[in-house]
Amino acid sequence: MRFKPLLMEVFTIPHQGQHILYFPFRHTVLLGNAALANLVGQANRGDVSAVQRLRETLGDKCDDIAVDEPGEHHLCVRQQPGPFKPTRVSLFLTEDCTLRCRYCYAHGGKSRETMPWDMVTGVIDRIFDNAAAAGRKTMAVNFHGGDPGAVWPLFVRARDYLRDREGSLGIHVTTSVGTNGVLDQAQRLWLTQNIDSATLSVDGPPAIHDSHRILPDGSPSSGLVMKTMEHFDQVKFRYGIRSTITAETVSRMEEIAHFLCSNSAAKRIQMEPMFPRGRAAGSDSRAPEAQEFVDNFRKARKVAAGFGRTLSYSGARLDVLTNVFCKACGDSAVVTPSGDITSCYEVADAKDPLAQVFFFGRYDSETRSFAVDEQRRARLFGLPVLDKPRCQDCFCKWHCAGDCPAKVLHAEGASTQDLPDRCLINRELTRDQLVAALGKD
């Protein structure tokens, strides 16, 4: 039996007077005392006698943490970039929006720039070409913005164009949309008949929702959004809910969870703390305190579980073993209304300072092709967690993978905190998942 420092990486986490011993590459969680924690540490450093003592102490359980062959785990390792030939794309059809959310991470609706039709078809054609060249029978298109509802005729026309190309090439397109739910009944019916899935933004009871998510004239949006959610449920449409939590609403997360579970059939609800970017940075809305978010998330999670639902948060995902937080680290293809290619949904404005990091090309209307800055794209592939010194001893390392790169870079540019608030949230909620894995929740 051999213990390899990388493949047998172990994290020791204090818990109620004992220690959680976590072996991410072995999908193993043990609970032990300080002596056992020290013994595992010695074994992991190559102490042969410690290995034998572990065998005597743990018996068969020792096999769970032993690694006999290198590469025996399923870590999603980011490779060097190959040619840019995406078979999935996110189309930001417009910067316009049918809401003026006070905490918007962008400035939705401030600009009405909309993607020209020849760009819509050109990008779609390139994705089909890439799928055909790769011998794929499927590809994926996500519609985003702004909000597609602000340019509804273009949204419908783009979906119709996809369907025409599907029929002629025999390549199936999976479609999804991020929507604020501000739709009329005809739009709701069309969406559920023509789009495969959606993420719907709802912040909870009307009074909470309408405190931040308002129409351009300042009036409430909850009436329209609730009707959209009701229609989704009536036709058994596949969708998830995303709720943004602010300092003003964090103490009501339990209530929000109960409302959403009582009024929606969505199986998965995601709650995220507001982040001060875009319009949010200049508004009265404030991000919640990290510990307060954690405490109230735990209450809301119990409510959701009682309804048979899953409450999630992006930085706590024990079921994901990876060295990158998301596809923004090189794999993503998001085309903005102006034709820029960004890897990050949250960085879609060329004037954003982070555009220098996440923008890596443009759609060329003359050649109807992608012009890519390979040096910038290669730098995106240099964002994995292994390149982040502050993460190396953290037990969340292979799950949050250094956290959302846009938020991390924004925080690093705005603050010198050693422990950003999201790190605290990530650690506490991931610790909860480890405790649950021990059966001691």
Identify what each model region corresponds to.
Residues 83-84, 88-119:
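Canonical Radical SAM [4Fe-4S] cluster-binding loop centered on the CxxxCxxC motif
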Residues 97, 101, 143, 200, ...:
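Conserved, mostly hydrophobic/aromatic
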Residues 3-31, 50-90, 134:
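N-terminal [4Fe-4S]-dependent radical SAM core
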Residues 3-7, 348-441:
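Flexible mid-to-C-terminal extensions adjoining Fe-S/redox cofactors in radical SAM and related proteins
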Residues 97, 101-104, 326-329, 344, ...:
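Short cysteine clusters
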Residues 1, 211-223, 230-329, 334, ...:
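Radical SAM enzyme [4Fe-4S]-AdoMet core and its adjacent flexible, acidic
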Residues 121-144, 151-274:
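Radical SAM/AdoMet-radical enzyme domain recognition
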